[in-house]
Amino acid sequence: MIIFLSIEWNNQKTFGEFDTYTKILNSFFLSVNFRTAGFNSIDLSGLKDSSLFYSTLLMMTGAGQGGTAGGMKITTIAVLIIMVFFVLKQSNQEPHIFKRTIEQKLINKAAAIVMFSSAYVLFVTLLLVETQDYPFVRILFEVVSAFCTVGVSVGDGGILSLSSLFDDFGKSIIIISMIAGRLGVFAFGLLIVGKAKTTHFKYPVGRIII
């Protein structure tokens, strides 16, 4: 909320003409909206690029695990933050919080979600940047909104979404992104790489320098 306020406070295309109360209310609404809702209280085409980029971070993070919103989910990000904290501490303890250990399998799953989601969004964004004549940040916003099933668009300054101005190839990519995001990372990944075969042996540990 504070980030939106600080960036858009004097932007005449968004918050500039509002009084202080309305500015605060709109910044709060935006900070919630980009994580789940898909509504507009202002014309999003007027947002500065820094606000649009911050919005993509909110959309990628998403909402809580029990909700219907898209994104990687708050708990996924939290698990990775806790893991990084313990790695930086070089602790010999397993990652834990609130006196509960976080299973390695759960950490691996969280890392896979973040890696796959980030790689997919980056690949599709670069693909659309090369095929559609629009700025990088705005295309990134459209891709993340589609993949995370948020339902917002930066708009064209009128009544149309930016994605509606893409050619047929660009529109198809956005549609595929929405389907991929709704299926979920693991279901979509399973369609691509297939299910692993069951094995009854274990390889020796490899010592790799990082």
Give names to the regions the model predicted.
Residues M1-I210:
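Membrane-proximal intracellular helices of multi-pass ion channels
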